[in-house]
Amino acid sequence: MGNSPSTQDPSHSTKKEHGHHFHDAFNKDRQGSITSQLFNNRKSTHKRRASHTSEHNGAIPPRMQLLASHDPSTDCDGRMSSDTTIDKGPSHLFKKDYSLSSAADVNDTTLANLTLSDDHDVGAPEEQVKSPSFLSPGPSMATVKQTKSDLDDLSTLNYTMVDETTENERNDKPHHERHRSSIIALKKNLLESSATASPSPTRSSSVHSASLPALTKTDSIDIPVRQPYSKKPSIHAYQYQYLNNDETFSENSQMDKEGNSDSVDAEAGVLQSEDMVLNQSLLQNALKKDMQRLSRVNSSNSMYTTERISHANNNGNIENNTRNKGNAGGSNDDFTAPISATAKMMMKLYGDKTLMERDLNKHQNKTKKAQNKKIRSASNSRRSSFASLHSLQSRKSILTNGLNLQPLHPLHPIINDNESQYSAPQHREISHHSNSMSSMSSISSTNSTENTLVVLKWKDDGTVAATTEVFIVSTDIASALKEQRELTLDENASLDSEKQLNPRIRMVYDDVHKEWFVPDLFLPAGIYRLQFSINGILTHSNFLPTATDSEGNFVNWFEVLPGYHTIEPFRNEADMDSQVEPTLDEELPKRPELKRFPSSSRKSSYYSAKGVERPSTPFSDYRGLSRSSSINMRDSFVRLKASSLDLMAEVKPERLVYSNEIPNLFNIGDGSTISVKGDSDDVHPQEPPSFTHRVVDCNQDDLFATLQQGGNIDAETAEAVFLSRYPVPDLPIYLNSSYLNRILNQSNQNSESHERDEGAINHIIPHVNLNHLLTSSIRDEIISVACTTRYEGKFITQVVYAPCYYKTQKSQISN
């Protein structure tokens, strides 16, 4: 396919026939095929067939006509040939033959080391050689052989654009070395053409086209050299190449380049200016490098940002705040908040600023949280020192005042109007004029708006010495206090509080009142359960509402209602049990007056009074507690609800009214009723029970003895007389049903014992009829209700008879 053979046939070198250049070109075209390489002995056969065709037919194949159209001045390599007269006119970039060798070996071996010469053909002339026994393997195709030589290194090729070797040197070199330069030339030709067409200086510098000489007319082709990608500026200001395949590119050099402001842009992104395929792994590597770069930038400038924002907030300078907001918006003169590469990519491509605003908000929240933690830690240190100085004084003031707490003045919090919506609640100073509540000054206003001061005391045993260890054991209170510490303390203190979480709260002994109490206990609204630990023994107090837990143990409980400043839970029943129970005529103690402000002033002012310490908590649907005296509590709640929750109204006791009249339902006799009214002297003596009067109260033996009249009437007759006067209702349905009796009879017949009578009723009652209330129809103005139970293998049926005057009432209504 364009390669001149290294050996010439002597029969054709001396004799030049007409049209021999077409045949030589055809043979030359066939020598580069797979058939010519595998079967070298068939070359003479091809030549003879070509000459025979030209002599007899005089026709030129189409491929020969194509070759004849060129100028026969040069050969395929662009130089004059002494062997042939066929030349090519214009030079071509692509060669026809890319085979590694065009000449056969001395021993006529092919590329596959195969020969087709037989034993009897050795030494014979070429004309007498028989055609080989193997047929052609297929159509002519180019032979390609893989090589291990590296074409990426331009230094080994010295940027050779044109093969400038002499003719002798080219003939001396092997075939694959003589034509290797054509590939390099084509590559550089393509790169130069693209470089000249592109006006961008960055594109020409990226391919190193400036260092290459000018292109001239060449007969060679080239393949672009694959160079390792490095960080190179692109046409976009925010895009760089992060896809680096060079393993020698260390991370230290990467950091050095990023530190240089001249070579690194702050808006480095993932998109690349080079035309290349981005698969999932390459994209993940690029994003990972972006995140590492941003993390290094954040760590290096986090301290600077925190100090700057803290300084701006402490001074309260509005200009600094506006400048910080402008810097967060994207100013290049000052330090800006780090923005992820994904957010910048979305902004550049689609104009979407959602991700950028989210990154800015996260950065602002992070810096303000760090500032608030520092402020809380400083305020906590001041609060602890202040509380240690005033705790004793406040405790004495509470004890001496007898818990008559005075209302506080309205709070005046100091609020910074320049705080954004992402800022955490700041510490607010509280001005107060009462020494009794000095301990409250150590609590921030955010907690004081939700929490209530709870006074818990132990009053049961006054003989407990001051040296006794008394604790309150409550997981509910401990969890509430833990949440308060997490809100007020910094991060390190909150971690310590989690480790030291203990449901035990120590109580302090009061020498004046001889009781134990818990100082400074502020709790949010809710229901709390607790127990008292006296020298390690868990017990409950009788002065607090009691309940039972899931295990059946007695516990105390109380409820904190919102809107109150101070409460002291205790049970009013304990005080009433210690005194003499009052009679119905005596007036019950009045409920203490409540000094409460209108609901509209809750947000601005708070109060505390003795009356707020409720003797009993209003009823609430707390299912985990079985409260004592729940009926009284429910009644009081209903009364309060009926009076529009007027807590100032006095609770009036209800008087019970008794009567000596017997209801008609229980009157059994001749219909005469006895009503006892007034004094006992007015009551007439009652007749003894008899057959005609109060038969229910009669003794059975006496009753039947009277009916038999001293033995004149037998027992059966007396029973018939009694049933005629007082008829007994029928049996329950399961004992007086023909259907059930028939089923029982069938079961008895199928049983093993056939000696029983057919009419016998099985005494075993179906279990579906047990513990069920059964009744019969109303007959003779009497209704009966029965229930059957099983007891130790026996069945017990209890029947209750009751009169029912349904017909009488119906007749009266009709009349």
UniProtKB/Swiss-Prot annotation:
Q: What family is this protein classified in?
A: Belongs to the 5'-AMP-activated protein kinase beta subunit family.
Complexes and interactors: Component of the SNF1 kinase complex, a heterotrimeric complex composed of the catalytic alpha subunit SNF1, one of the three related beta subunits SIP1, SIP2 or GAL83, and the regulatory gamma subunit SNF4. The beta subunit serves as a bridge between the catalytic and the regulatory subunit. Interacts (via KIS domain) with SNF1. Interacts (via ASC domain) with SNF4.
Return the Polar residues bias intervals: 1-11, 32-42
Q: Which GO terms describe its molecular function?
A: protein kinase binding
Entry annotated with the keyword Phosphoprotein:
yes
Q: Which UniProt keywords apply?
A: Cytoplasm, Lipoprotein, Membrane, Myristate, Phosphoprotein, Vacuole
Outline what the protein does: Beta subunit of the SNF1 kinase complex, which is required for transcriptional, metabolic, and developmental adaptations in response to glucose limitation. Has a structural role, mediating heterotrimer formation, and a regulatory role, defining carbon source-regulated subcellular location and substrate specificity of the SNF1 kinase complex. Promotes the PKA-regulated relocalization of the SNF1 kinase complex to the vacuolar membrane in response to various types of carbon stress.
Membrane topology, as annotated = Peripheral membrane protein
List the biased-composition ranges (Basic residues): 363-376
**One GO term of the biological process aspect:** signal transduction
Q: Which PANTHER family match?
A: 5'-AMP-ACTIVATED PROTEIN KINASE , BETA SUBUNIT, SNF1 PROTEIN KINASE SUBUNIT BETA-1
Primary subcellular site in the record, as a coarse category: cytoplasm
Q: Which InterPro entries match?
A: AMPK1_CBM (IPR032640), ASC_dom (IPR006828), ASC_dom_sf (IPR037256), CRP1_MDG1_kinase (IPR050827), Ig-like_fold (IPR013783), Ig_E-set (IPR014756)
PTM details? Phosphorylated by SNF1 in vitro.
Which residues bear N-myristoyl glycine-type lipidation?
Answer: 2
| Chain positions with Phosphoserine modification | 33, 181, 198, 200, 206, 209, 220, 331, 494, 497, 643
- Map out region (Association with SNF1 kinase complex (ASC) domain) in residue numbers: 724-804
Q: Where in the cell is it found?
A: Cytoplasm; Vacuole membrane
- Name used for this protein in its record: SNF1 protein kinase subunit beta-1
UniProt KW Membrane keyword: yes
